[in-house]
């Protein structure tokens, strides 16, 4: 029987050496862009990089800390006029608290204008509407003026309240979440609605719930 002999550099030695993935590889960059762009309602500018978070960070963003039937953590934040406002101010009436990614982005503008167009329905239901994002008060003021928003916008710079409420991020943790809460007169959460890509549906769902309270 004929035999085949391999040269000294056998097949395994011809294959590239693969380095094992270490803990330092948990966050792998998947997007880098030097110029400004927008993606699903979020602004990216000047060397913005997105990364896939580690399994532990994903777990923390998926499981919310505030659940239906609970009273959420209170807050005191500045509104678009620079005045401080606390959640306790709304005790005794229903309140819609919606977290959104950023002012002046396509999805967030649609959502804000949809709340504006239905604002009288919310007032008729006896409810207040409050929007929260990480933008500063001056950004909120310009945003509210441009689109004639009749409700309060609060500045959560550093996203402290977003984290305390456990608002989940989207797209592997790279996008701030778009989540709406409806609190009843006692300050207890009766609805949590999350929909990043259909911002107008937040209005339909919250009105439906308010009409049943």
From Swiss-Prot:
Its EC number is 1.11.1.24. Keywords: Antioxidant, Chloroplast, Disulfide bond, Oxidoreductase, Peroxidase, Plastid, Redox-active center, Thylakoid, Transit peptide. It catalyses: a hydroperoxide + [thioredoxin]-dithiol = an alcohol + [thioredoxin]-disulfide + H2O. The keyword Magnesium does not apply. Disulfide bonds join 108-113. Its main location: plastid. Induction: By pathogen attack. It holds the Pfam family AhpC-TSA. Residues 66-213 form the Thioredoxin domain. GO terms for cellular component: chloroplast thylakoid lumen; chloroplast thylakoid membrane. Residues 1-54 form a transit peptide. It is found in: Plastid, Chloroplast thylakoid lumen. The active site is at 108 (cysteine sulfenic acid (-soh) intermediate). One of its GO terms (biological process) is cell redox homeostasis. One of its GO terms (molecular function) is thioredoxin peroxidase activity. The active site is a conserved redox-active cysteine residue, the peroxidatic cysteine (C(P)), which makes the nucleophilic attack on the peroxide substrate. The peroxide oxidizes the C(P)-SH to cysteine sulfenic acid (C(P)-SOH), which then reacts with another cysteine residue, the resolving cysteine (C(R)), to form a disulfide bridge. The disulfide is subsequently reduced by an appropriate electron donor to complete the catalytic cycle. In this atypical 2-Cys peroxiredoxin, C(R) is present in the same subunit to form an intramolecular disulfide. Monomer. Thiol-specific peroxidase that catalyzes the reduction of hydrogen peroxide and organic hydroperoxides to water and alcohols, respectively. Plays a role in cell protection against oxidative stress by detoxifying peroxides. Involved in the plant defense against pathogen. Belongs to the peroxiredoxin family. BCP/PrxQ subfamily. This is Peroxiredoxin Q, chloroplastic.
């Amino acid at each position: 029987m004929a035999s085949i002999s391999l040269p000294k550099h056998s097949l395994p030695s011809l294959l590239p050496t693969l380095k094992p993935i270490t803990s330092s590889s948990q966050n792998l960059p998947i997007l880098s862009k030097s110029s400004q762009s927008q993606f699903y309602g979020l602004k990216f500018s000047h060397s913005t990089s997105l990364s896939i978070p580690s399994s532990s960070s994903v777990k923390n963003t998926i499981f919310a800390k505030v659940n239906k039937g609970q009273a959420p953590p209170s807050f005191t934040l500045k509104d678009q006029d620079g005045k401080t406002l606390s959640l306790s101010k709304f005790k005794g009436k229903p309140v819609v608290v919606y977290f959104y990614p950023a002012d002046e982005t396509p999805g967030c503008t649609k959502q804000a204008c949809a709340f504006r167009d239905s604002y009288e329905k919310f007032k008729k239901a006896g409810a207040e509407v409050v929007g929260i994002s990480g933008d500063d008060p001056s950004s909120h003021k310009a945003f509210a003026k441009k689109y004639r928003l009749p409700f309060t916008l609060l500045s959560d710079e550093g996203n402290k309240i977003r984290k305390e409420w456990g608002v989940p991020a989207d797209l592997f943790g790279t996008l701030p979440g778009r989540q709406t809460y409806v609190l009843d007169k006692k300050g207890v959460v009766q609805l949590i609605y999350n929909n990043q890509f259909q911002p107008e549906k937040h209005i339909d769902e919250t009105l439906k719930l308010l009409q049943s309270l």
